[in-house]
Amino acid sequence: MIKLSVLKNQQIDLYLNSTIGDWVANHIKWNLGMVYRHGNRSESAYQDKFHNFGKYAAISVHWPSIFSQSKIDEYRFFLNVHSGLLPESRGMYPVFWNVFEHTPAGATVHQITSKLDYGPILFREEVAYSEFESCRSVWSKVFELEKRLFIATANLLSNFPDSLPMKKPVGNIGLNRKATEFHHLKSNYDRLNLSKKEYVRLKLALDF
């Protein structure tokens, strides 16, 4: 986790995995000049060196664990940058499922709640991709969008608003995809009864 030391005796905590951790640290260092880092970015246990600060907000990006309600309740705002359009693309590996099922791809910033990937939405934006584009290609577009939305979120929080312009999720609530579903398809696609079109789409989705 990375801590941002900020004004008004507040703090913004960042829960990041290694995919985005270095980029975020470097970006904030060069653009905001206030990053403080401790612990290994790929580990979940950190020593809190800023325990005297108030708990204002946190941003999560690709964090591998589900946050407990007690952890969520520590912050006024606890926002997650999700690599899918919510509430449709919930759960693990949304870009994979977007490519396999040829559904809209994008990224969402939302408040973390007890219902996974279904909190009020701050930002939600789609990326365009073609029918025969690989998961690798679509993911690169989504990742660039996530970076942009992360910066927009951090900038918004840096002003310490008492409220954020969040909207209730609308549309179909998607399945909460599990990692086991992905690994089952990846390991058994040659033994599944897939149509030719499904097989082609799965090969594209597995190209990452």
Regions of interest found by a model, annotated:
Residues M1-F208:
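One-carbon transfer enzymes
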